[in-house]
Each structure stands twice: as C-alpha cells, then as structure tokens.
Amino acid sequence: IFTEWLDPAVLDESNPSKRDPELDLWNPQNPNKPPFTPEYVARFRAAQVARNRRITAQVREKLAELDEASAAWKGDGSGNPGWQQGERDRAFVVSCTQADLRRLDTSLDPNGREPTSLLDLAKENHSPVGLARFTTLRSWLSQWSYDESNADGPKSLAQIKVPVLVVANEADHLVPLTHPRDMFEAIQHHDKEFHLVKGATHYYFGQNELMAGAVEHVMGWMRKKGFLEQEFVEAS
C-alpha cells in the first residue's frame, strides 16, 4: 500500500519542491481533477512505482559505497576501528508519502469513506511526519522497496495454516477494501472469516460503539477458536 501513497510528482529526492506539474495534485495548472480518468490513474500509478524504484536504486548505490569504504579501511595503527568500518547503514528521509488518488476520488475502490480535502491531504503529504518519512537504507529494502521487500501480506497469508480472522473498516479512508479482501482470498484454507465493520473509519474517532463491537467480535472469534484462556476472558 505504501507505493500507492507515494507522491509521484517528486522529481528530486533531495528537493521535493521540484515536481512534475501534471502529476502534482496541488498544482492549479494540473488539468486532471477527480473523478480521475482510467488513463490518468494508470499513469499516476506507474509513476509511483517508478519513484519507488528510483529510491531503491539510490539506496543500493549508497550501500555499495558504504560497503566499499568499510572494506577499504586499513586502520591507523591504533587498533581502533574507523567510523568507515562500522557504518553499515545510514538514515535518510523520504518526503511526500501521502498522495493516494483514492483520498480525493471516492469512486476509486469505493467504500463508505468521505473524500479528503486537498488542504488536509497537503498537510499530511508535505509535513515532516508520515509513513516511512524517516527510514534507513536497509530498512527501505526490507520494508518499503516495491521490488525487494518481503513484506507482502497476500503472499505471506498464502502460507498460513492456522485459523484467520480478517477485519476491515467499511469507511476506512486509508486502507481500501480491496486490500483486506485480497488478503482474505489469498488464504488457502477454509478456516477463515471476513468481518466488515459497517461505518467504521480508520481510527474509529468518535465511534466508541463501533470500536467496542469490533473488539467484541474479535474476542468472540478467539473464544470460539480456543485462543483465549478462560481466566483472561473473565478478567476482560
């Protein structure tokens, strides 16, 4: 899902203000507005993947430099390792990671969510906080790289042999219903259940009753499957 959130307008990772105007959702000269055409969606998604791959290439290049410096360090005769020898990773920033078209266009993967305003989405996308904003070279490859990360929900769930409960929020503005449904379908056995919480948003803000109902459903499922000790059930 991370790549589907990446802002593809960013042309220079060191300066996110250098942007492709036709992919910039906040550029008033961009003629593409919601509802977006299938052609624009395809172009936007391809550009998101391309940006992810550019970052991965930069990460690989920097890791190679670190490995080369570490291997070349001969020491200074003191017996103490140099910093070049110890630096096996490096932190970096990924700017602009909140530009999912679905936030603006609720006809894409429709559910019960409300559209996000451009201003609110800008606050998320342009701010110094956000998904994967601060990471490291190796963390990027492990968790966020489109081609190299093993963090693949459906792929992992296909190997699960134990009972599975998938819970989805019907009005979630961040996680489209297609994702939990894909995860559910990826499970190869039949001891699985899909539960949709009607009207629930991503964070359940102001939805205490829906939250309580979701928790009770999970608890009930765990009791039914024998995953809760009786003492814990009574205490809760």
PLM feature spans:
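Alpha/beta-hydrolase-fold enzymes
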Residues: 2-116
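Acidic catalytic loop of the alpha/beta-hydrolase fold
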Residues: 7-8, 171-175, 203
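Catalytic active-site module of serine/aspartate enzymes centered on a nucleophile-bearing elbow/loop
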Residues: 198-236
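Conserved beta-strand scaffold positions in the cores of enzyme catalytic domains, especially
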Residues: 194-196
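Short beta-strand/loop motif that positions the catalytic acidic residue
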Residues: 159-160, 166-168, 172
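Eukaryote-specific, low-hydrophobicity, charge-rich regions
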Residues: 100-145
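Active-site nucleophile elbow and catalytic-triad environment of alpha/beta-hydrolase enzymes
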Residues: 8, 137-156
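Short alpha-helix in the alpha/beta-hydrolase fold that links the catalytic acid
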Residues: 12-16, 152-153, 162, 176-185
